[in-house]
Amino acid sequence: MKWLHLLSVVACVADEVYAFPSHLHGAVGHLTASRLSSVVDEAVRSAHEKRLLFDAGNEPIDVTGKHEFIPPNFEKGDQRGPCPGLNALANHGYIKRNGVTNLVETIGAINKVYGMGIDLATILTTMGVVFVGNPLSLNPGFSIGSTPKGNDNILGNLVGLLGKPRGLVGSHNIIEGDSSNTRADLYVTGDASTMAMDQFESFYDMASDEGTYDFDTFAERAKIRFHETIETNPDFYYGPFTGMIVRNAGYFFACRMLSNHTKGSHEDIMDQATLRSFFAVQKEGDKLTYKRGWERIPTNWYRRSVDYGLIDVNLDVISLITKYPELGSIGGNMGEVNSYAGVDISDITGGVLNLTKLLEGNNLLCFVFEVVKTVSPNSLSGLFSIVVPPLKLITDALGTALLDLSCPALKDLQVGGESFSKGIQKKFPGAKINASL
């Protein structure tokens, strides 16, 4: 199956523009698109081959030798960002230790170390490359933190890229969204990357009497944070992709892929020591201390034996919404706290889907992919002067996904009689940054 990608937007553009003659855009664009598709295909093929050579579950992940823990050197420009899993991969040398990685490296690493399915790994990695990195580089990549200082060309800028790649720190409403487990909302603090220790401690204290956390604990925490954000963030936005899928997947990923799956174990049970290690928290007596960027894979830690892929995310989101229906409500606050308003899915889809039908089969993924397909063309025009390559990645991925998932035909998506993008941004103040999926 040819998974190439997903996603939406970054509208804020830096002053510096890399211009290119308009009459050459078509030829260059199609050549770049073809080359980039080949890079993605090679990444998937390589990851599959390495996966066959790796006997998951029979040995702990190596954290010695070339994979020993080395914390980041921020003074030298090392990058760390909002994703604990990627930060840990960099600290152990599974991706480049400076935190500026590429497509092939990242797909292979998150599959090998964490057991993320290659389909899901490809989608998320390509998302990072297209929307916060540089897909037009000869070596397409992205920063897991912010734009590397002192080396604006570290990602190999070519023609067609507007401004500088911003890294995952600049991915609000694209990859990173409001109401996360351990990160504050961007509009509230101005920093959605650094862990908020009070939020970590609140979750840490939810451990069972045995000091563990299961799926139900993470699901309850997702519900709690949703309501906390309504009460504290006047610009809270909970979109179909960044809210229902990505935001909630952040809770599941910690449970499903960061838990220690000791030899022979198929349970996704997180313990406090593992949680502290992956979230860069050290314990001395009863005191917990956060060391930014020090996320670490524990010694004698085993990856899951069965990969966690796109369909697993779908099932987990459906399970979550079934238990806490408010987490299936697309919408946001209206500029004031406690002013949350939802958008009727039936209205968006022209009556094809409602919340009940959305939770049947693969309809949730189908709907979200349709949102991405609808929003992407205008979104990408704010990022690239040559839109063909990144847009082709998205349309290829969505076309493949929609066919594989046997998706229903959906009419043009609208909000309040306008296009989805315009309608959602007009209705919710928090949706105005980037293109907001």
UniProtKB/Swiss-Prot annotation:
Binds 1 heme b (iron(II)-protoporphyrin IX) group. This is Aromatic peroxidase fscJ. PANTHER family: HEME HALOPEROXIDASE FAMILY PROFILE DOMAIN-CONTAINING PROTEIN (PTHR33577:SF16), STERIGMATOCYSTIN BIOSYNTHESIS PEROXIDASE STCC-RELATED (PTHR33577). It is an enzyme of class 1 (oxidoreductase). It comes from the Eukaryota. Aromatic peroxidase; part of the fragmented gene cluster that mediates the biosynthesis of fusarochromene, a tryptophan-derived metabolite closely related to a group of mycotoxins including fusarochromanone. The role of fscJ within the pathway has not been identified yet. The first step of the pathway is the epimerization of L-tryptophan to D-tryptophan in the presence of the NRPS-like tryptophan epimerase fscC. D-tryptophan is subsequently hydroxylated by the tryptophan 6-hydroxylase fscE to yield 6-hydroxytryptophan. Belongs to the chloroperoxidase family. Pfam families: Peroxidase_2. InterPro entries: Chloroperoxidase, Chloroperoxidase-like_sf. Heme binds at C83. Residues 1-19 form the signal peptide. Keywords: Heme, Iron, Metal-binding, Oxidoreductase, Peroxidase, Signal. Pathway: Secondary metabolite biosynthesis. Its EC number is 1.11.-.-. GO terms for molecular function: metal ion binding; peroxidase activity. Its cofactor is heme b.
